[in-house]
Amino acid sequence: MSQSNNVTDLARANIRALTPYMSARRLGGNGDVWLNANEYPLGTEYQLTTQTFNRYPECQPKHVIERYAAYAGLPPEQVLVSRGADEGIELLIRAFCEPGQDAILFCPPTYGMYAVSAETFGVERRTVPAQADWQLDLPAIANNLEQVKVIYVCSPNNPTGNLINPADLQAVLALAQGRAIVAIDEAYIEFCPQASVSNWLKDYPNLVILRTLSKAFALAGLRCGFTLANSDIIQLLLKVIAPYPLSTPVADIAAQALSPKGIEQMRQRVSEVRANRAWLQSALQDCACVEQVFTSESNYLLVRFTASSSVFKVLWDQGIILRDQNKQPGLANCLRITIGTRQECERVIAALAPLAGIDNSNNIDNQSKTHSQTSSIRKGTI
């Protein structure tokens, strides 16, 4: 075996070649309006009710599991809590995929951690691009299931914001029966709870649902997520999860967030986000630099601009940080905008107003009239 003075040569080849997931915080920025990570814009306050920090925590804190189970309408044995839904993504790969042999499948454009998690564990990443309307390409999925052990489907999908057709989800579950786990990522389901498939668990033994407290519960900094599945899958995941996945303070705050009061506060936040989303969507459609605003069932909007790189920089320079989606398949000139407070949404529109001669009813010149005539043709919402 040859020796090297470079310690990085000792690392696995796939890790040396890996491009890490570029989270909003890794990308940085010096803004004061953070609309790039789908976080709730205002902080939440909790007081710790326990001080037993000298003791290791439970692997699965009973009060957290029981409260989330009650919230989800499931028995506690069908719930697992982890360090965010991201850990749930990894646990499925660790439990079901043989490195160098098995594959996961996902349908871009979608959440980037499915790919990164698979690559980290030496598992093949197989992609079946979504159709033009961002729904699943069922024939292509059926033709790509060889050696696939986990299929990830995000609904509402990040970053597009659309729900996946329930009939298509059922079709995928049927295709994968006896072959693969189907993990439905419901990180944003609180913004459209009627679309949850949690009541399907009794009918599909290969169904897994991923949830989080990071979005509607406004606890992104807590890192607390949940995996919902039949008890035999939960027992497998308990074999590969860390012995103490949740710290005592995290479990304490999570339990408070899942109390009746905490759930009511979450629903109030959802109502506010929906109202601000509707306002921002309407205002964006009046912007001359906007080509298309895509309908969203979540706490963000995907927007196609005439020149997204310029728009991104203009807003960045004004302290408004968005998420660039240009590198995602089919999302050229698209930026994702988290729904912030009404004031933050108004700042976005104010920053966009001067770009490409946005129509201004208080200052209509010939140029703005031209934009007004063409915008109704060019702009749309789907």
Swiss-Prot record:
The modification N6-(pyridoxal phosphate)lysine is found at K215. Pathway: Amino-acid biosynthesis; L-histidine biosynthesis; L-histidine from 5-phospho-alpha-D-ribose 1-diphosphate: step 7/9. Residues 363-382 are annotated as: Disordered. It holds the Pfam family Aminotran_1_2. It is an enzyme of class 2 (transferase). InterPro entries: Aminotrans_II_pyridoxalP_BS, Aminotransferase_I/II_large, HisP_aminotrans, PyrdxlP-dep_Trfase, PyrdxlP-dep_Trfase_major, PyrdxlP-dep_Trfase_small. It comes from the Bacteria. Keywords: Amino-acid biosynthesis, Aminotransferase, Histidine biosynthesis, Pyridoxal phosphate, Transferase. GO terms for molecular function: histidinol-phosphate transaminase activity; pyridoxal phosphate binding. GO terms for biological process: L-histidine biosynthetic process. HAMAP family: HisC_aminotrans_2 (MF_01023). NCBIfam families: hisC (TIGR01141). Homodimer. This is Histidinol-phosphate aminotransferase.
